[in-house]
Amino acid sequence: MRQLLCLLAIALAPSAVFAQPARPDWNEPFPAHQIIDNVYFVGTVLLGSFLITTPAGHVLINSDFESTVPVIRESVESLGFKFEDIAIILGSHAHGDHMQADALVKELTGARVMAMAEDVPALRRMRPGDKEHPIDRILEDGEQIMLGGTTLTAHL
């Protein structure tokens, strides 16, 4: 019986990762602020989202949950940037609380979604609102992303 319960818990765990936030404070705003140079915090009290600004558009790291997008948008705009200028969406790792809203942010901004090759299988199973999770570019360890004079290096 114990073994069956453990297997059941393991089998159901991924669905919890892709679900909407169970905690209302996950969407509680936190003051947007500059971290250093062109890197800004635009997340919530419990969810870390970051904006890297460039003259050619911006990079959003962690779109979080779909219900969090209005908070992120407000944070971006409170810093004087346009949400629509997001050109690239990245995620720290393939969990719903970091990348579930990629499709929505892409729809709102036209941004390209990029993900590590190792995250692709989990992202393909992530279907918020029964939408396919977009992946425009698959990144390998050490690969570089360049935008507006800023270079990011993907690391696993």
Q: Where do the PLM segments sit?
A:
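Bacterial N-terminal signal peptides
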Residues: L5-A16
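Boundary at the C-terminal end of the N-terminal hydrophobic targeting segment
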Residues: V17-P21
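Conserved beta-strand hairpin/beta-sheet module of binuclear metal-dependent hydrolase folds
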Residues: D25-F83
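Residue-level detector of beta-strand face positions
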Residues: F41, L51, Q144-M146, T153
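Active-site HxH/HxHxD metal-binding segment of metal-dependent hydrolases
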Residues: S67-P70, E77-L147
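Ligand/cofactor pocket segment of small-molecule handling proteins
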Residues: E140-D141, T150, A154-L156
